[in-house]
Regions:
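Sec-dependent signal peptide recognition
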Residues: 1-4
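Active-site signature of cysteine proteases
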Residues: 95, 105-139, 301-306, 312-408
Length: 408
């Protein structure tokens, strides 16, 4: 089991630099102990997929936290407090596990294999070094925890299921289907306009999350082709779709081919570039592009209840997650996270794990592997019809080919 004494020191150390507002002291039945954190970490790593190693003796390297401005429900005091929402448990030679810091919240909020995050005084630091999708998904986890502690009055029953046979669902997972985590920078942005803004890479604007997500989708739907809208590939698509990261395009022909494909998709869907080096496009137009290219064999629905079922039932079943412009400034301010300003962010969901009855979707963010991982799906804040104080205004498009479509 995880080294207790070292972990206890780290847990207290993560709050040594206290912010100005005092930490709220609430009912002890909501307190998350080190033993609870240990159980949550072990549960998060149970039945790992996608090549994550199975840790027999996971050892914690560091524990950090995110806090939010907080006022207890029905409080008549004017004092503002700080509430710890999430623990970020970094393992030695392992992933970072996001664990709820209050038992009204969920035990597990995420498993991030390659996270490189910095914290201080309960805040996420160096946010300008994180792409918008990464901040978005971390903010989604923190918002979910905040919603739980402010809208519920009893402990979440999933804490009692940690490391129990009843809590395990060995059939509740789907291996990811998209092999790539290319990102939006070099070489995909080779043909983007010149830019010196914060989102530029090597002097070029970002390739854009929507065309990159569409190119990623093609790696699932198309095994090979030699001509892409009149452009003759110098290498085969079969090779390109197996270049798992943007650093794996070593040959000039490969770099040029993938840049042309992503750039042409951007042109076809009317992508525009902003002064800061970011790119803006509409996923709706992207779906029309995909449908045309796949010979009208593409089908999709927008039913949140079908996301995991579509992945299981259909060989090409994946989901594009669309996040519109966020207007919930007060929520992001409370979380201390910079609100993503892009008009639309497109993320690929192509796998999932179920932990104690909760579903964590694998998010391929389109901005590199450090932003990818499993994130807890919370229907109270993800969906566009979610309650306004915590809503993230997300929409899903569950994609499949009409040739392999199965009724659920």
């Amino acid at each position: 089991f995880i080294l207790f004494s070292a972990c206890l020191f780290l847990l207290s150390a993560c709050n040594n630099d206290k912010p100005d507002a005092p930490e709220i002291q609430e009912n002890p039945i909501f307190k998350v102990s080190m033993q609870d954190i240990q159980k949550a970490v072990r549960d998060a790593l149970d039945n790992p997929i996608n090549g994550m190693p199975n840790f027999d003796v996971p050892v914690i390297d560091a524990i950090d936290s995110i806090q939010a401005d907080y006022r207890p429900a029905q409080s008549t005091e004017k004092t503002h407090y700080r509430k710890t929402l999430l623990y970020f448990v970094k393992l030695v030679k392992g992933p970072t596990v996001m664990v709820g810091a209050d038992k009204r919240a969920e035990p597990i909020y995420g498993i991030l294999p390659n996270a490189d995050l910095k914290f201080g005084k309960g805040k996420l630091l160096a946010q300008d070094q994180l792409q918008a999708p990464c901040r978005l998904m971390i903010g989604a986890a923190a918002a979910s925890a905040l919603c739980a502690v402010e809208t519920t009055t009893t402990p979440n029953p999933r804490w009692a299921l940690l490391q129990t046979e009843k809590g395990r669902n060995m059939a509740g997972w789907q291996m990811t289907k998209c092999p790539v985590v290319w990102g939006q920078g070099y070489p995909l942005n080779l043909l983007s306009p010149s830019s010196e803004g914060p989102y530029a890479d090597r002097g070029k604007a970002a390739a854009g999350s929507v065309p990159v997500a569409l190119a990623q989708t093609l790696t699932v739907f198309k095994k090979d082709f030699s001509v892409f809208y009149g452009y003759n590939l110098k290498t085969s698509w079969a090779k390109l779709r197996n270049r798992t990261s943007n650093t794996s395009f070593t040959a000039g022909d490969e770099q040029n081919d993938i840049a042309v494909i992503v750039n042409y998709i951007g042109i076809s869907i009317g992508q525009v570039y902003n002064k800061d080096g970011s790119a803006t496009a509409t996923l709706r137009r992207g779906l029309d592009f995909l449908s045309d290219y796949l010979g009208r064999s593409l089908g999709y629905d927008q039913n949140w209840n079908n996301v995991s079922r579509n992945m299981k039932a259909n060989s090409h079943g994946i989901t594009l997650l669309s996040v519109g412009e966020q207007n919930n400034d007060a929520l992001w301010k409370r979380l201390g996270i910079e609100r993503p300003k892009s008009s639309e962010i497109c993320l690929l969901l192509d796998g999932f794990e179920q932990k104690n009855g909760a579903t964590l979707f694998y998010v391929n963010s389109g901005c590199g592997e450090k932003a990818n991982g499993y994130y807890l799906y919370d229907d109270k804040i993800w969906q566009e019809v979610a309650r306004s104080p915590y809503s993230l205004n997300m929409k899903v498009y569950n994609l499949y080919t009409t040739t392999d479509y199965d009724e659920f």
